[in-house]
Amino acid sequence: MNQIQVFISGLILLLPGAVESHTAVQGLAGHPVTLPCIYSTHLGGIVPMCWGLGECRHSYCIRSLIWTNGYTVTHQRNSLYQLKGNISEGNVSLTIENTVVGDGGPYCCVVEIPGAFHFVDYMLEVKPEISTSPPTRPTATGRPTTISTRSTHVPTSTRVSTSTSPTPAHTETYKPEATTFYPDQTTAEVTETLPDTPADWHNTVTSSDDPWDDNTEVIPPQKPQKNLNKGFYVGISIAALLILMLLSTMVITRYVVMKRKSESLSFVAFPISKIGASPKKVVERTRCEDQVYIIEDTPYPEEES
């Protein structure tokens, strides 16, 4: 069978270049595909050749995939395109590894036989791989099923007291939405647990209208009022302390000013009194001297001539 294919391929290559040939080849995605191209080295010798994409009779492997010099590969576009035959013996069949659907299209083999170029055209069609394994996704059968959910709040503290507030009791009803799905009939129960309740919480509100919905809510005590009163007293104490400090400063300042003023007045009075006494002493001294003079003139009477 292989000899017949080689013989037919050789006849196709020996046809004149003007005669067009078009061979259809089919492949499966994910598997290698081989496009045969064999020429006789006894007729024209070992010659260069190339593989190209598209119709390359008029473009001569412009979109080249592989070039050979007749002995080895000189250019390779991608490792997916390989020549696995004996190149020097004329077996230049192209093998495309791991094909995909996008690899489909025209391919051409060009052999540079002296005096003329010979072409072999192929139209490759790659079909997608058909999976034979059974589907892993189960099919949903049966009638629609409704899941009913029930919320249960379980407080961890056992201490419960009733507030004396005249406000009416608060009732809370939890009604979850129903969800419908189709696999199997199941009923799910959802339980929610509240966090730990502090020991200083006193007010509780309990709703028991529905036996399925038993929700207990804990309300913290009203402590902000106590904190507000404490802050008010602290503010008053600070204000009183500031006023007392201000009054003390004013009294001390007034005392210092009055003391300095009294000292300055006593210092000025002393020189004035001292200056006022001096003229009196001078007058008395002058009078005393006059009297002395009078006494001195009296003991010596004038002699009569």
Swiss-Prot record:
Protein's cellular compartments: Cell membrane
Stretches assigned to the Extracellular side: 22-231
Coarse class of the protein's main subcellular location: membrane
Record membrane topology: Single-pass type I membrane protein
GO CC terms in record: cell surface; plasma membrane
Record topology, Cytoplasmic segments: 253-305
A biological process term (GO) from this entry: iron ion transport
Record keywords, A-Z: Cell membrane, Disulfide bond, Glycoprotein, Immunoglobulin domain, Membrane, Receptor, Signal, Transmembrane, Transmembrane helix
One GO MF term: ferritin receptor activity
Disruption of the gene: reported phenotype: Deletion mutants lead to ferritin accumulation and iron overload in the retina leading to retinal lesions.
Gene3D superfamilies: Immunoglobulins
Glycosylation-annotated residues: 86, 91
Note, other: Belongs to the T-cell and airway phenotype regulator (Tapr) locus, a single chromosomal region that confers reduced T-helper type 2 responsiveness and protects against airway hyperactivity (AHR), the hallmark of human asthma. The human genomic locus appears to lack the Timd2 gene.
Superkingdom assignment: Eukaryota
TM region(s), chain numbering: 232-252
Record's subunit section: Homodimer.
Expression sites by tissue: Expressed on late differentiated Th2 cells. Expressed also on all splenic B-cells, with increased levels on germinal center B-cells, in the liver, especially in bile duct epithelial cells, and in renal tubule cells. Within retina, mainly expressed in Mueller cells.
Domain Ig-like V-type: 22-125
Function: Cell surface glycoprotein that participates in iron homeostasis in the liver, the kidney, the retina and oligodendrocytes by acting as a receptor of H-ferritin. Mechanistically, mediates iron-containing ferritin uptake via an endocytic pathway, trafficking to endosomes and subsequently to lysosomes. Plays also an important role in the regulation of Th2 immunity. Receptor for SEMA4A involved in the regulation of T-cell function, enhancing T-cell activation.
Signal sequence bounds: 1-21
Source species taxonomy: Eukaryota, Metazoa, Chordata, Craniata, Vertebrata
Protein name: T-cell immunoglobulin and mucin domain-containing protein 2
Stored InterPro entries: Ig-like_dom, Ig-like_dom_sf, Ig-like_fold, Ig_sub, Ig_V-set, TIM_domain-containing_protein
Low complexity bias spans: 131-167
Presence of the UniProt keyword Coiled coil in the record: no
Family label: Belongs to the immunoglobulin superfamily. TIM family.
Residues covered by region (Disordered): 130-174
